[in-house]
Regions:
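Non-heme Fe(II)-dependent double-stranded beta-helix
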Residues: 2-38, 44-152, 158
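Non-heme Fe(II)/2-oxoglutarate
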Residues: 2-21, 65-73, 197, 222-224, ...
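Short, conserved beta-strand element in jelly-roll/cupin
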Residues: 157-176, 216-219, 224, 248-252
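Double-stranded beta-helix
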Residues: 174-232
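Short, basic/aromatic beta-hairpin or loop at an interaction surface
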Residues: 191-203, 282-299
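Short, flexible, surface-exposed loop segments at domain boundaries
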Residues: 256-282, 294-334
């Protein structure tokens, strides 16, 4: 049985450690069996540390410019005591405000030769990374008092029609206090008497406590999990360390990948997207089209069909998943 990780925080239940999948690399059938059983793969020390270091360096450069970390450290983000009331790395999807989102270091990272080669081996194909990246620099002491789980949810309800895998990686050491990410093992599969999984998140107390898994993370580790796997970030209870991580979403490039571009035309029946290659692609929209926009607490919630032409604007950067010409999913690039 996996070791238990315990916490001095009374709101944090003991959790078993994630199963490590390194021994499955190179065995496609074994990887698929583990995925079907658990809903995730966890790998230790598989991502090139130099590439991870360069990615972390972008985070640290941004945070030094903000004046909130010890400028002498290049291995971690250590709070220097500066006020954090207006700390802008909030990952809330608001355009033009998050300085890490403006830098968008994911693109350089996934083209690093060793990183690209590893993910192609893992996916068994060249990888299509959707323009949806989460950059986390969670301040020390962040989170609600008495609640360690930041937001219980699955990504599937908010990503209709996209067969994505979520790839989460720590960029600096994450110990028990700093938190990291926890997930519920084996609860990705359809089952009778399941708990509701609405787009706005999963209710407290419905996930069996013995399903939760976590780890103490190091740079080079990688956690890949299903869109249907319940998970949550854990509140950062450290006194001084920011929690640095990035999660990206990908699928085999040979699959039915979404169209990425800007909105060129839109009405109550269809949307046209202009791609960087100069193409214009038009898709029907209907009552089943899941379209989301950035709108505060309702970010991630689907728009009604009549709201789509009102709230999506010409020129908006989006990506669109489609099935036989009908858009199943529309969302802003992020």
């Amino acid at each position: 049985m996996a070791d238990m990780i315990t916490s001095t925080s009374t709101d944090t239940p003991p959790m078993r450690e994630l199963r490590v999948s390194n021994h499955l690399l190179g065995d496609r059938a074994a990887l698929e069996r583990a995925w079907e059983r658990d809903g995730y793969w966890f790998f230790r020390d598989v991502l090139d540390k130099d590439a991870v270091g360069r990615l972390r360096g972008v985070y640290l450069e941004v945070m030094r410019d903000l004046g909130v970390i010890d400028p002498t450290r290049d291995d971690a983000a250590v709070h220097n005591g500066a006020p954090l009331d207006d700390f802008p790395i909030r990952n809330d999807g608001t355009a033009g405000k998050d300085p890490l989102m403006l830098r968008y270091p994911r693109d350089a990272f996934v083209t690093e030769p060793k990183i690209k080669a590893f993910f192609e081996q893992l996916f068994g194909d060249e990888v299509f990374w959707v323009p949806n990246t989460e950059y986390h620099a969670l301040p020390p002491g962040a989170g609600r008092e008495g609640r360690r789980f930041n937001f219980l949810h699955c990504d599937g309800p908010n990503n209709k029609g996209l067969p994505l895998k979520i790839c989460w990686m720590p960029l600096a050491p994450i110990d028990e206090e700093t938190g990291g990410l926890a997930l519920a093992e084996g609860l990705h599969r359809p089952r009778m008497h399941d708990f509701p999984r609405p787009p706005e998140g999963i209710a407290d107390g419905v996930i069996p406590q013995d399903a939760w898994r976590r780890a103490l993370y190091q740079p080079g580790d990688l956690l890949v999990f299903s869109l249907e796997t319940p998970h949550s970030g854990l509140a950062n209870r450290s006194d001084s360390y920011f929690r640095l991580s990035m999660d990206i979403r990908g699928m085999p490039k040979s699959g039915n990948v979404p169209t990425v571009g800007t909105v060129a035309a839109l009405d109550a029946c269809a949307i046209t997207v202009a791609t960087e290659a100069g193409e214009q692609r038009t898709f029907r929209i209907d009552e089943d089209t899941f379209c989301r926009v950035t709108r505060g607490r309702l970010t991630g919630m689907p728009l009604a069909l009549k709201e789509i032409p009102q709230m999506v604007k010409i020129g908006d950067p989006v990506y669109v998943a489609a099935d036989h010409g009908t858009a199943t999913f529309i969302r802003p690039q992020h």
